[in-house]
Design a protein with these regions (language model features):
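Glycine- and aromatic-enriched mobile tails/lids
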Residues: 1, 5-29, 33-236
Length: 236
């Protein structure tokens, strides 16, 4: 399942050059925002209990252990906090000609047509070109409500700013993975390929391009009390 890579305590991890996981101090991801790497390529619909209950509890216990009561937050460089403020103000004061709803509709239709469950190289490559159009449209986006109180226009624009980037990354990752696995079903690569693709995809948006790397899948247990369950074909 997709999400921010974490260890089983919910601590966010970053990949190093020697392929080892390094903890990002103080940063945690919990629930469906995280990828602990227990569900493989997919999980049954609505079955989030492991992520939410088991690892959610583990994350809470870990946070209680490492965060001292009444401790102050470490100083954050003003240059970093300013990035968030600048993004907020840029979108709030956007005076382009294209409403957010128009760009969002284009994004939704592109993802539905070009990145549905069943896909192939042709339709995904077409989708990569199409999804860049609403992304480029961010430069001409219009936010009519400039207020700071219950501004749904601004909220929807902030949401779209996130969604369009996730859409670009999703499309690129799907086009890059030359196999079928879980809910990723390629008409041109119908079989799962554990030899070449038994790994997590890591993706970074860089403008209109996507940088792709990989992270190993855990194929071991932390104790001898339970056995490792190898992946199986998804059949019903």
């Amino acid at each position: 399942m997709g999400g921010i890579p974490t260890n089983y305590y919910g601590e966010v991890i970053s990949k190093t050059e020697n392929n080892k996981d390094v903890i990002v101090p103080g940063l945690m991801a919990v629930g469906e925002a995280a990828c602990v790497s227990v569900h493989g390529a997919n999980r049954l619909g609505s079955n989030s209990l492991i992520d939410l209950v088991v690892f959610g509890r583990a994350a809470a216990m870990r946070a209680a252990k490492i965060v001292k009561p009444n401790s102050k937050h470490e100083n954050i460089p003003e240059s970093e906090t300013q990035k968030s403020i600048d993004r907020f103000n840029k979108l709030r004061n956007a005076n382009g000609k294209t409403p957010t709803s128009v760009l969002r509709d284009k994004m939704q239709r592109t993802m539905q047509k070009h990145c549905a469950v069943f896909r192939d190289a042709k339709i995904l490559k077409e989708g990569m070109n199409e999804i860049k159009k609403p992304l480029q449209g961010m430069e001409d986006i219009s936010v009519s409500d400039k207020s700071l109180i219950f501004n749904t226009d601004l909220i929807e624009t902030l949401e779209f700013d996130n969604l369009i980037r996730q859409s670009l990354v999703t499309m690129a990752s799907a086009e890059n993975r030359k196999e079928s696995r879980g809910a990723h079903s390629r008409e041109d690569f119908k079989d799962r390929d554990d030899e070449n693709w038994m790994k997590h995809t890591l993706a970074w948006q860089e403008g209109e391009k996507v940088k792709i790397d990989y992270r190993n899948v855990h194929n071991f247990t932390l104790s001898n009390e339970v056995q490792y369950f190898p992946p199986k074909a998804r059949v019903y």
